[in-house]
């Protein structure tokens, strides 16, 4: 019986060693490729007129940056264009608005934050970017920034 117990112990140790090697082999030395942003589902768009392309309108991409912070990860960010609520963004989503050239007010908020607005110059000029980023600061407050391509 003691001989059989020793064999069991060795087999268990060997299995654990192989499992540990397999786990460490999965650790890559380079980070994974970034995952593309998911579009907001059509069912969550309250005012679809802002998300439909048309002649003379310029595409404006608003992205909700990914966060690992559990406090803000599952909060939806309400998105407003010129004072009208259009949709909400979850972690890792984006929405494309089609707006006329000129200055528009793009705003974001959560159930805990007041609306934060950004005067956003929409232009077809390729020297400017038509992309905005929704993030949360270290106090878990929502922020909106214009970002470069």
Where are the regions a protein language model picked out?
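Secreted/luminal cysteine- and crosslink-motif detector
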Residues: 8-10, 22, 28
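Bacterial N-terminal signal peptides that target proteins for export
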Residues: 2-16
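Bacterial N-terminal signal peptides
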Residues: 14-24
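Short loop/turn and low-complexity linker motifs enriched in small/turn-promoting residues
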Residues: 2, 27-149
């Amino acid at each position: 019986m003691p001989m059989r117990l020793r064999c069991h112990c060795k087999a268990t140790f060997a299995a654990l060693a192989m499992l540990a090697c397999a786990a460490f082999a999965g650790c890559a030395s380079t980070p994974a490729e970034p995952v593309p942003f998911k579009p907001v589902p059509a069912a969550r768009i309250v005012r679809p007129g802002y998300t439909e392309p048309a002649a003379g309108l310029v595409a404006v991409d608003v992205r909700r940056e990914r966060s690992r912070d559990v406090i803000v990860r599952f909060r939806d960010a309400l998105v407003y264009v010129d004072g009208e609520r259009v949709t909400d963004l979850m972690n890792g989503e984006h929405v494309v608005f089609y707006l006329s050239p000129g200055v528009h007010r793009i705003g974001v908020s959560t159930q805990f934050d007041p609306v934060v607005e950004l005067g956003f110059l929409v232009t077809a000029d390729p020297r400017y970017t038509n992309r905005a980023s929704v993030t949360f600061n270290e106090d878990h407050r929502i922020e909106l920034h214009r970002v470069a391509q």
